[in-house]
Amino acid sequence: MNSAQKKPQPPPLSLPWFQSVNRFWVQNQGRFMAKIMPGEYYVTNQQELIGTVLGSCISACVRDPASGIGGMNHFMLPQNAGGGRMDILSDAFRYGNYAMEHLINDVMKLTGKRSTLEVKIFGGANVIRGMSSVGDKNIEFVRRYLEVDGFKIASEDVGGDYPRKILYDPTNGKVMMKRLKSLHNDTVIQREEHYMDELSHTKVAGDVDLF
């Protein structure tokens, strides 16, 4: 093992409000990774990776190219909110707005920039049994949100029938993605079904100010 791959002690300090996010050492990358679950997001100003596994959910990867500060979220829209409406008054739209604006706000708190932010999106596969529109609605929302807010999508890999494993490096904007065409178990699907059930009983938070 060379010195660049030795595990540092302790891991780099996370921002205070992300201390509950699971972080661990990835040997073949020589860095720590923050693993986010459905409903979570993570922003870092350290030399860290951010990873997740997506089924129907969406992840937006957002960073400031000049500083290498960035983050990623992992969310889906509530499926029983608004009767299928996809407008700014629906609870589904408000929840998606909340998920996106928290991520963007936190990146901007550290960089002070908005116009130069780089955005990439992933996920939205049709993997939940009997609900083929879930992924499509998530894709529709995130594209519309970014268009309305004036963000261009630098790259995307969305839709299809397979979950995706994502590893994001905010320092250079690279995303390593693997389509999981064969799953050893239903963990990804079960996790998203549980998250969907939680969303159906969760009151949508109020508006978020965008800095």
From Swiss-Prot:
<dbReference type="InterPro" id="IPR038592">
    <property type="entry name" value="CheD-like_sf"/>
</dbReference>
<keyword id="KW-0145">Chemotaxis</keyword>
<protein>
    <recommendedName>
        <fullName>Probable chemoreceptor glutamine deamidase CheD</fullName>
        <ecNumber>3.5.1.44</ecNumber>
    </recommendedName>
</protein>
<dbReference type="InterPro" id="IPR005659">
    <property type="entry name" value="Chemorcpt_Glu_NH3ase_CheD"/>
</dbReference>
<comment type="similarity">
    <text>Belongs to the CheD family.</text>
</comment>
<dbReference type="GO" id="GO:0006935">
    <property type="term" value="P:chemotaxis"/>
</dbReference>
<dbReference type="GO" id="GO:0050568">
    <property type="term" value="F:protein-glutamine glutaminase activity"/>
</dbReference>
<comment type="function">
    <text>Probably deamidates glutamine residues to glutamate on methyl-accepting chemotaxis receptors (MCPs), playing an important role in chemotaxis.</text>
</comment>
<dbReference type="Pfam" id="PF03975">
    <property type="entry name" value="CheD"/>
</dbReference>
<dbReference type="InterPro" id="IPR011324">
    <property type="entry name" value="Cytotoxic_necrot_fac-like_cat"/>
</dbReference>
<keyword id="KW-0378">Hydrolase</keyword>
